[in-house]
């Protein structure tokens, strides 16, 4: 593709990704094509929900820090630490009792169980949003600055070791998962609240 084609694609992609934050005619066009036609969504999301999604996407850990302060006391993490420790003990006992597994395979499984990472509730170190400039009344500009902020953050990590303490989702996300690549299980604070836990 030539440079003009690439520029046109980048401009179209920018408008498409920013459409939910633009004036209503862009929101409507985006909904009609992306959400209704392509995804079958029967109605557009309300404006306030789009706003919450935008802020959550840009400053998820800042919101998460407040969420944790309000809804995730230290004893909740301690209870979960104990529960997971008991699960690991039970898994270790079951592993030792397996008669179909060779001694070499058991040794590998034991090592994997012992090396099992655990993230409970929230990151130990919160992300710093101090360099992100937010201006009241400038949603589009804020979105562009947020993109730049994220780009700079990712670029600053190039060539450096992977941060094993970084979380893939925010504390206020209702989810839990096992990451097989990192051999870790993650329980964000929100999944450890009633009615889920």
Model regions and ranges:
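Second-shell loop/turn segments in exported
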Residues: 69-81, 94-99, 173-174, 195
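Active-site-adjacent "gating/activation" loops or surface patches in catalytic cores
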Residues: 136-197
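Noncatalytic, helix-rich "gating/capping" subdomain that lines the substrate-entry/channel surface
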Residues: 1-82, 86
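Charge-dense polyanion-binding interfaces
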Residues: 124-140
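Short amphipathic alpha-helical coiled-coil/interface segments
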Residues: 80-95, 109-120
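Amphipathic alpha-helical coiled-coil segments
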Residues: 97, 119-128
């Amino acid at each position: 593709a030539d440079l003009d084609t690439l520029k046109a694609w980048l401009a179209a992609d920018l408008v498409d990704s920013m459409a939910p934050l633009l004036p209503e005619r862009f929101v409507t066009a985006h909904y009609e094509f992306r959400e209704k036609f392509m995804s079958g969504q029967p109605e557009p999301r309300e404006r306030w929900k789009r706003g919450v999604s935008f802020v959550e996407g840009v400053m998820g850990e800042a919101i998460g820090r407040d969420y944790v302060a309000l809804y995730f006391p230290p004893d909740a993490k301690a209870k979960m630490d104990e529960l997971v420790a008991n699960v690991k003990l039970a898994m270790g006992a079951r592993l030792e009792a397996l008669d179909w597994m060779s001694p070499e395979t058991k040794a590998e499984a034991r090592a994997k169980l012992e090396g099992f990472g655990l993230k409970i509730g929230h990151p130990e170190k919160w992300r710093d949003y101090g360099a992100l400039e937010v201006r009241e009344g400038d949603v589009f500009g804020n979105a562009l600055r947020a993109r730049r902020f994220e780009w700079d953050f990712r670029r600053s990590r190039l060539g450096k070791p992977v941060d094993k303490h970084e979380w893939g989702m925010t504390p206020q996300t209702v989810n839990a998962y096992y990451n097989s690549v990192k051999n870790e299980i993650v329980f964000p604070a929100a999944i450890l609240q009633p009615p889920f836990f």
